[in-house]
Amino acid sequence: MTNIRKTHPLLKIINDSLVDLPVPSSVSSWWNFGSLLAACLAVQILTGLFLAMHYTSDTATAFNSVTHICRDVNYGWILRYLHANGASMFFICLYIHVGRGLYYGSYMYSETWNIGILLLFAVMATAFMGYVLPWGQMSFWGATVITNLLSAIPYIGTELVQWIWGGFSVDKATLTRFFAFHFLLPFIIAALVVVHLLFLHETGSSNPTGIPSDPDMVPFHPYHTIKDILGILMMLTMLSMLVLFSPDLLGDPDNYIPANPLNTPPHIKPEWYFLFAYAILRSIPNKLGGVLALVLSILILAVIPLLHTSKQRTMMFRPLSQCLFWLLAADLLTLTWIGGQPVEHPYIIIGQAASVLYFTIILLLMPLTSIMENHLLKW
């Protein structure tokens, strides 16, 4: 008798995705981050659901409702900090996942890659709206500054911003709609994840060598299930340590001050995972130019498959490209640092140099280096 997991219409889909899925035997731990992202999404949806039961999306009570969750709700404090720091873990895994895709040429699977870019935008939008909900000073002013960027769009900018605000400033209507979208988007993300996996399983995973691995496959279970469980346990350990020992390490102290439209904080800045994009935005003196650079800093991922000039898929055997990749990683860390600094000398010029370098590496240096490596291989 055939196993039910191979014949049942529903179980068959799960079986083909998580049990009998052929995986290249050479995939390393860099391939773990997909499952870690799924775990992060599950943690965020669960903690978010319970937080939503106690949160009120009204300007008069939002800040107090978060305080109430932390003080009066059973284990409310741990839910709140798991959710806040879970977002940080989410972005750490997300950036490593994208970095692995760049390093090992996973962008050659264009459908999977493009859905991934869409997912990145959706997660960033969700995180931004979530940051507004506690209605502290940084929530209010962050929402004001970032939504105001849309006013740089010619002709329709001002009307568009007021339409998003639901009034003439960030107020009750804005908070209510941000809560509605923040609740809805993770479920849309979950649906997109299924589509992401659907396209991935059409082609199968890539591997560190970049050569076809059809003759050398292993089943997903038990090899990669055990490997993924280990990764998830390690991530949950890190998250638990962050939540239990220093829950406010990655947050902004200004967000413990209730939102006040009459008092601007000295340094308005987003959460750490947006600082690199914020630094690129600030490095351009022109408003529209800054907004375009901000969007392009993420959207540039979409043109990377077109810029692939190497005869090899991955960077595993391309030392010059590896140097550029790690230079790009260092540049992003520099931008993250600059984004958290005040707008003054020498931070301005460092930010501008790092922003120019970011686009130069991706658009110019990487394709040219790949061409050079192709010629070196002829020797």
From Swiss-Prot:
Q: Extra info from the record?
A: Heme 1 (or BL or b562) is low-potential and absorbs at about 562 nm, and heme 2 (or BH or b566) is high-potential and absorbs at about 566 nm.
Q: GO: which molecular function terms? A: metal ion binding; ubiquinol-cytochrome-c reductase activity
- Subunit relationships: The cytochrome bc1 complex contains 11 subunits: 3 respiratory subunits (MT-CYB, CYC1 and UQCRFS1), 2 core proteins (UQCRC1 and UQCRC2) and 6 low-molecular weight proteins (UQCRH/QCR6, UQCRB/QCR7, UQCRQ/QCR8, UQCR10/QCR9, UQCR11/QCR10 and a cleavage product of UQCRFS1). This cytochrome bc1 complex then forms a dimer.
What name does UniProt use for this protein?
Cytochrome b
Q: What does this protein do?
A: Component of the ubiquinol-cytochrome c reductase complex (complex III or cytochrome b-c1 complex) that is part of the mitochondrial respiratory chain. The b-c1 complex mediates electron transfer from ubiquinol to cytochrome c. Contributes to the generation of a proton gradient across the mitochondrial membrane that is then used for ATP synthesis.
Family matches, as InterPro entries = Cyt_b/b6_C (IPR005798), Cyt_b/b6_C_sf (IPR036150), Cyt_b/b6_N (IPR005797), Cytb/b6-like_sf (IPR027387), Cytochrome_b (IPR030689), Cytochrome_b_C_euk/bac (IPR048260), Cytochrome_b_N_euk/bac (IPR048259), Di-haem_cyt_TM (IPR016174)
* A Pfam family assignment: Cytochrome_B
Quote the cellular component terms of the Gene Ontology held in the record.
mitochondrial inner membrane; respiratory chain complex III
Its gene is MT-CYB
Where would you find the membrane-spanning parts of this chain?
A: 33-53, 77-98, 113-133, 178-198, 226-246, 288-308, 320-340, 347-367
Q: Which residues bind heme b b562?
A: 83, 182
- Locate the residues binding a ubiquinone: 201
Similarity field = Belongs to the cytochrome b family.
User: What keywords were assigned to this record?
Assistant: Electron transport, Heme, Iron, Membrane, Metal-binding, Mitochondrion, Mitochondrion inner membrane, Respiratory chain, Transmembrane, Transmembrane helix, Transport, Ubiquinone
Membrane topology designation? Multi-pass membrane protein
Domain of life the protein comes from? Eukaryota
Q: What is the lineage of its organism?
A: Eukaryota, Metazoa, Chordata, Craniata, Vertebrata
Q: Which PANTHER family match?
A: CYTOCHROME B
Signal sequence region: none
| Cofactors that this protein relies on | heme b
| Cofactor-binding details, from the entry | Binds 2 heme b groups non-covalently.
Q: Where does heme b b566 bind?
A: 97, 196
Q: From its record, what is one biological process in GO terms?
A: mitochondrial electron transport, ubiquinol to cytochrome c
Question: What subcellular compartments does it reside in?
Answer: Mitochondrion inner membrane
